[in-house]
C-alpha cells in the first residue's frame, strides 16, 4: 500500500490543508524514505532518526527546516498508527539541532510601494499589479492568494474572504490602491477566462495561476522595479504585518488579519517594530548619536 499517498489524501481532504502545504509534507516524508533506504517504516528506530538528523545537519540544512521535517515525520507515523496499525513512532521525543533565530525579512514602505507600482497596461501586467497590490494590502499567504475566487471579493465593502490554514475562513480589508487595481483587472480577466473558471487570478490559458507562476512573476517584477535582494511572496506578507504594526501598534488586529491561531506567532513582528524604533531613536535622540571618528 502507498502509505504516503494515503496520508497526503488525509491532509488534503480531512484536514483541509492547501495543495502547497501538502506538497511540502510530501517532500519532507520522501526525504525520510530516501534516508531510510531499505529500512521499513515498522523497523525504523530512534537511533536511525538521530542519524538522519545528523546527516541533514551535515548537509547544511538548518534547525528550523529539520524541525519542520521532524514534525512531518511525527505526524506521518501517528497517522500510520491510527489508520494502519503500524504502532511505531521513532520521532517521539526527538529534537532538531538549534539554529540562530532569524527575523522575517520585510521591505521598507518605500520599497513595497515601488514594487507594487506597476503602470504597464499589458494584460498580464494589469493582473500582476492587482495581485501584488492585494498581496501587500491584505497580508495574504501565497496559497491563500492563488486559491481566491472572484466571488470572495466585495469591492463595495472593501473586503476579501480568505480560506487559510485548516480551511478556516476570515474576512480581510482591502486597501484603496488594491481595489482600484482589481477594478482594472476584472474586465481583463473576463476576456481571458475559460467558461467555468472561478479563480480571481488566471494565466494566458484562462486557468488558475499556480504558486510557482506567482513566485516567478514577483521575482521578475522585483528585478524590473529595482528591488534588491531575495523578493519572495511571503516578504509582502511580512511587510504588510510590519508596516501595519508600526502604524497602529495593535498586535491583536494584525493577528486577526494574518489569520494566526496563536498570538505568539504574530509577536515576532514586535521585534521588527522594535528594530524600527531603535533605528529612529539612534537617528533622532541627541544622546544616542554616535561620535564620528
Predicted features and spans:
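Conserved catalytic core of the tyrosine transesterase superfamily
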Residues: 1-293
Amino acid at each position: 500500500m502507498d502509505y504516503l499517498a494515503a496520508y497526503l489524501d488525509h491532509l488534503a481532504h480531512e484536514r483541509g490543508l492547501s495543495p502547497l502545504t501538502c506538497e511540502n509534507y510530501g517532500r519532507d516524508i520522501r526525504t525520510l524514505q530516501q534516508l531510510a533506504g531499505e529500512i521499513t517504516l515498522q523497523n525504523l528506530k530512534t537511533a536511525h532518526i538521530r542519524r538522519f538528523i545528523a546527516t541533514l545537519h551535515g548537509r547544511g540544512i538548518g534547525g528550523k527546516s529539520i524541525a519542520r521535517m521532524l514534525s512531518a515525520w511525527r505526524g506521518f507515523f501517528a497517522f500510520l498508527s491510527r489508520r494502519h496499525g503500524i504502532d511505531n513512532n521513532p520521532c517521539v521525543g526527538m529534537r532538531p539541532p538549534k539554529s540562530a533565530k532569524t527575523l522575517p525579512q520585510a521591505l521598507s514602505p518605500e520599497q513595497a510601494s515601488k514594487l507594487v507600482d506597476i503602470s504597464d497596461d499589458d494584460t498580464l501586467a494589469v493582473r500582476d499589479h492587482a495581485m501584488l497590490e492585494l498581496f501587500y494590502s491584505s497580508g495574504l499567504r501565497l496559497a491563500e492568494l492563488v486559491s481566491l475566487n472572484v466571488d470572495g471579493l466585495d469591492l463595495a465593502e472593501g473586503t476579501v474572504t480568505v480560506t487559510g490554514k485548516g480551511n478556516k475562513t476570515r474576512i480581510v480589508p482591502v486597501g484603496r490602491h488594491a481595489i482600484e487595481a482589481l477594478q482594472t483587472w476584472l474586465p481583463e480577466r473576463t476576456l481571458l477566462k475559460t467558461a467555468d473558471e472561478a479563480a480571481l487570478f488566471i494565466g494566458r490559458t484562462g486557468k488558475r495561476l499556480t504558486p510557482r507562476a506567482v513566485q516567478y512573476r514577483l521575482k521578475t517584477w522585483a528585478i524590473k522595479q529595482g528591488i534588491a535582494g531575495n523578493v519572495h511572496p511571503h516578504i509582502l506578507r511580512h511587510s504588510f504585518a510590519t508596516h501595519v504594526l508600526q502604524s497602529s501598534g495593535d498586535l491583536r488586529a494584525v493577528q486577526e488579519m494574518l489569520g494566526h491561531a496563536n498570538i505568539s506567532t504574530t509577536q515576532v513582528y514586535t521585534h521588527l517594530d522594535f528594530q524600527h524604533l531603535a533605528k529612529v531613536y539612534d537617528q533622532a535622540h541627541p544622546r544616542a548619536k554616535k561620535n564620528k571618528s
